[in-house]
Regions:
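PLD/PLD-like phosphodiesterase catalytic module centered on the HKD motif
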Residues: 1-182
Length: 182
């Protein structure tokens, strides 16, 4: 008999990639995340953070307002003992010293800087008890990217043994190991 999680993932993938008319209320169904009157990317990031056991964020650009949008949830996670890792860069000189100082105040998040040329990643990984989820797309950790701008992001969920999450985490770890602590 198939594991309940695997069955749920199969049904979610079938709805997301084969037949949109299938009934499936699972939170594992792939989703297009956009900013409009009905939804925004920030809400999806917060929803994933609220349910995760750990998280990894890789973004080129971060603003103080973007960080402020998540500060409460980051503090809540800290009180629950949930830790995260964040990689960013000095690409195009966008990130400010004040923003870096704000990042350093987040006790449960390790922060590193990469010097990879042209670093322009936008990836969010959330480890949950039985599965992982990821948001991959065009949204940096800025208030406008998460709430206002026209952005395309995909929310995908995967079994912890899935190849996609394995490869994404490997990319993150290689980048992490070759980055410097903030």
């Amino acid at each position: 008999m198939e594991d309940k999680l695997i069955l749920n993932l199969k049904q979610s993938l079938k709805k997301g990639f084969i037949d949109k008319n299938l009934t499936n209320e699972s939170n594992l169904t792939p989703k297009l995340l956009v900013n409009n009157n009905n939804q925004n990317v920030l809400t999806s990031i917060i929803n994933e953070l609220e349910k995760c056991c750990s998280f990894f964020i890789s973004v080129a650009f971060i603003t103080e307002s973007g960080l402020a949008s998540l500060k409460t949830i980051f503090n809540d996670l800290n009180h629950k003992g949930i830790k995260g890792k964040l990689i960013t860069s000095n690409y195009l000189g966008f990130n400010t010293p004040k923003m870096y100082r704000e990042l350093l105040k987040l006790e449960n998040i390790e922060v590193r800087l990469t010097d990879v040329e042209g670093f322009h990643a936008k990836g969010y990984i959330f480890d949950h008890k039985d599965y992982s989820s990821m948001i991959i797309g065009s949204s940096n950790l800025t208030s406008t990217a998460m709430k206002i701008n026209y952005e395309h992001n995909i929310l995908l969920s995967t079994h912890k043994n899935g190849e996609l999450i394995y490869n994404l985490k490997n990319q993150f770890e290689v980048l992490w190991e070759n980055s410097i602590s903030l």
